[in-house]
């Protein structure tokens, strides 16, 4: 096989439409754009979501919901990630030092995901039931 003999498989490539090249081509004169109107002009297009002056669907449907501002300062930490914390005490500052949560986080919750091998003391963090059972089974404890 030589590089200069390579060619695409037969029928896999299509020649581009040649617009405005005579009436015999079927795409002469107006080039498949029809007669007059905004879409026949060069640069003529309507913005996404425009429905010809009718009230658009996006505006016909009601607004709903909101984003809680508390979600920006809250985080979940997996049980398996606690292995990255140096030391036996896990609190918010220890999580920040281990880069498990960002500096703007004020509330963290430990959730049961993965396993924990070392005994740790969790201070001042919320813990799910399953995570609490797993921490205590590993010899750790939870302090409020």
From Swiss-Prot:
PROSITE patterns: RIBOSOMAL_L15
Keyword vocabulary terms for this entry: Ribonucleoprotein, Ribosomal protein, RNA-binding, rRNA-binding
Residues covered by region (Disordered): 1-57
Compositional bias per record (Gly residues), positions renumbered to this chain: 21-31
InterPro entries listed in its UniProt record: Ribosomal_uL15, Ribosomal_uL15/eL18, Ribosomal_uL15/eL18_sf, Ribosomal_uL15_bac-type, Ribosomal_uL15_CS
GO biological process terms held by the UniProt record: translation
Superkingdom, taxonomy of origin: Bacteria
GO cellular component, one term: cytosolic large ribosomal subunit
One MF term in the entry's GO annotations: structural constituent of ribosome
One Pfam family per UniProt: Ribosomal_L27A
Record's compositionally biased regions (Basic residues): 32-44
Assembly notes: Part of the 50S ribosomal subunit.
Family membership: Belongs to the universal ribosomal protein uL15 family.
Described purpose of this protein according to its UniProt entry: Binds to the 23S rRNA.
NCBIfam families per the UniProt record, alphabetical: rplO_bact
PANTHER family: 50S RIBOSOMAL PROTEIN L15 (PTHR12934), LARGE RIBOSOMAL SUBUNIT PROTEIN UL15M (PTHR12934:SF11)
Protein name: Large ribosomal subunit protein uL15
Lineage of producing organism: Bacteria, Pseudomonadati, Pseudomonadota, Gammaproteobacteria, Vibrionales
Gene this chain is encoded by: rplO
């Amino acid at each position: 096989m030589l590089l200069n003999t390579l060619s695409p498989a037969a029928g896999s490539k299509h020649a581009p439409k040649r617009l405005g090249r005579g009436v015999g081509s079927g795409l002469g004169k107006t080039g498949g754009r029809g007669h007059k109107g905004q879409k026949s002009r060069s640069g003529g297009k309507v913005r996404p979501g425009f429905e010809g002056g009718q009230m658009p669907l996006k505006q016909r449907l009601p607004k709903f919901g909101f984003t809680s501002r508390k979600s920006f300062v809250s985080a979940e930490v997996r049980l398996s990630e606690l292995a990255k914390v140096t030391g036996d005490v896990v609190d918010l500052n220890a999580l920040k030092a281990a880069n498990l949560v960002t500096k703007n986080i004020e509330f963290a919750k430990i959730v049961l995901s993965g396993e924990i091998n070392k005994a740790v003391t969790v201070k001042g963090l919320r813990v799910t039931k399953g995570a609490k059972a797993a921490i205590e089974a590993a010899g750790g404890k939870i302090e409020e």
